[in-house]
Amino acid sequence: MSLGQRLALLASRLQEPQRVASFQRLCGVEVPLSSPAADEDAETEVRGAPGEPRRRGRQPGAEDSPAKADCCGAPNGVRNGLAAEPGPTGPRRAGSQRRNSLTGEEGELVKVSNLPLYYLFCLGTELGNELFYILFFPFWIWNLDPFVGRRLVIIWVLVMYLGQCTKDIIRWPRPASPPVIKLEVFYNSEYSMPSTHAMSGTAIPIAMFLLTYGRWQYPLIYGLILIPCWSSLVCLSRIYMGMHSILDVIAGFLYTILILIIFYPLVDLIDNFNQTYKYAPLIIIGLHLILGIFSFTLDTWSTSRGDTAEILGSGAGIACGSHAAYTLGLSLEPSLHMLPLAIPPLTVTLFGKAILRIVLGMLLVLFVRDIMKKITIPLACKLSSIPCHDIRQARQHMEVELPYRYITYGMVGFSITFLVPYVFSFIGIS
């Protein structure tokens, strides 16, 4: 057997849904014998195209696929609640009985016998969700180091955009259920290869280490511990949730390493261009919009298209906001002779200002997001002559979803790097 055949055989085995199900059982996740899902295991399965795993029902990425509903804490109108028999090992609704904001779909009833692992992997999967991003990047920009925060966003946008587009090109379905138990339905309508959670969970800690080591004074061992812990937690959480095969996660990890090798040397150049070039905002907005339109042509409707527009809008807004802040002198960064920076001692005053900035800043950001959401969807429907009485259906049109996500999160990003720092400077807490 040649090397190529061996690698193909290995990849085929790593893609098997039975391996995902085995990992779930090892971690204490099972379908209760009395649940409807257990009774359905014997139902007839639908066989896909050659080389694809067996699966039932709707295919991920299809037009009538459900939109997403997070596992542990995503926004977008999900609902929390307790399932019947909520004991430590009793049946519970996957994702704490979360309901999909666009279709009303809920996770299936499952039995979790290892709650510490359940909550640990919920934390891991949240490290790749909107709630985390909307807290993490502003915290860096407002409280820690805007220089690092801006560059983290550039890397995140590159990695996530390439990952989402690759999914829509390869079009591999999610692991078949059964045997896999879907603990999450938020991303169930998207394709599987590669895992963009694994990509962001690999890119962010590596980029944090590369950007901060030498700029800040801290032991090298901290970074060497952070990277494998963060990345492995996110990667394993996607297998635990039943969202990805082992192959998806490994491919996402390796794909991210390749992207960082190619693009990381350009990050300084991109950030300097965003801040200093006179016509940077026009180029940023136009380029990100073109990339968004291209991604929308790769496949029929799925929730990943809206995510891609959201990522591009956020990146464009943060870049334009950093340009405005630099132009008006709001970007106060230490000179090169002050490097490496010493980590200041944590005092009551420092902690209080940090909490005040994050609370006040997030209130302003969420206010901007809600206002823009209420404006952009009806306006996009009106301009496109699409009925807006059914928001779920309207958002399946590119003419509505792309401008809604792009403009709304573009303003969110602009607020993070310009409007909020301007308010901080005005009231004296910058």
UniProtKB/Swiss-Prot annotation:
Q: Which UniProt keywords apply?
A: Cell membrane, Endoplasmic reticulum, Hydrolase, Lipid metabolism, Membrane, Phosphoprotein, Transmembrane, Transmembrane helix
Question: According to the UniProt entry, which residues carry Phosphothreonine?
Answer: T103
The reply to whether Repeat figures as a keyword in the UniProt entry is: no
Q: Which reaction does it catalyse?
A: sphinganine 1-phosphate + H2O = sphinganine + phosphate; sphing-4-enine 1-phosphate + H2O = sphing-4-enine + phosphate
Q: Which InterPro entries match?
A: P_Acid_Pase_2/haloperoxi_sf, P_Acid_Pase_2/haloperoxidase
Transmembrane portions of the chain: 121-141, 152-172, 193-213, 216-236, 246-266, 279-299, 311-331, 348-368, 409-429
> Topology with regard to the membrane?
Multi-pass membrane protein
Q: What is its main location?
A: endoplasmic reticulum
What is annotated as the active site?
H197, H244
- Reported consequences of knocking out the gene: Mutants appear normal at birth, but during the first week of life they exhibit stunted growth and suffer desquamation, with most dying before weaning. Their subcorneal layers, including the stratum granulosum, stratum spinosum, and stratum basale, are significantly thicker, whereas the stratum corneum is thinner than in wild-type mic.
Q: Which Gene3D superfamilies match?
A: Phosphatidic acid phosphatase type 2/haloperoxidase
A GO molecular function annotation here is:
sphingosine-1-phosphate phosphatase activity
Q: How does activity depend on pH?
A: Optimum pH is 6-7.5.
Q: Which SUPFAM superfamilies match?
A: Acid phosphatase/Vanadium-dependent haloperoxidase
Provide the residue span(s) of the region labelled Phosphatase sequence motif II.
194-197
Query: What residue range is the signal peptide?
Result: none
EC numbers: 3.1.3.-
Briefly, what is this protein's role? Specifically dephosphorylates sphingosine 1-phosphate (S1P), dihydro-S1P, and phyto-S1P. Does not act on ceramide 1-phosphate, lysophosphatidic acid or phosphatidic acid. Sphingosine-1-phosphate phosphatase activity is needed for efficient recycling of sphingosine into the sphingolipid synthesis pathway. Regulates the intracellular levels of the bioactive sphingolipid metabolite S1P that regulates diverse biological processes acting both as an extracellular receptor ligand or as an intracellular second messenger. Involved in efficient ceramide synthesis from exogenous sphingoid bases.
Family of the protein in this entry: Belongs to the type 2 lipid phosphate phosphatase family.
UniProt-recorded name of the protein: Sphingosine-1-phosphate phosphatase 1
Q: Which organism is it from?
A: Mus musculus
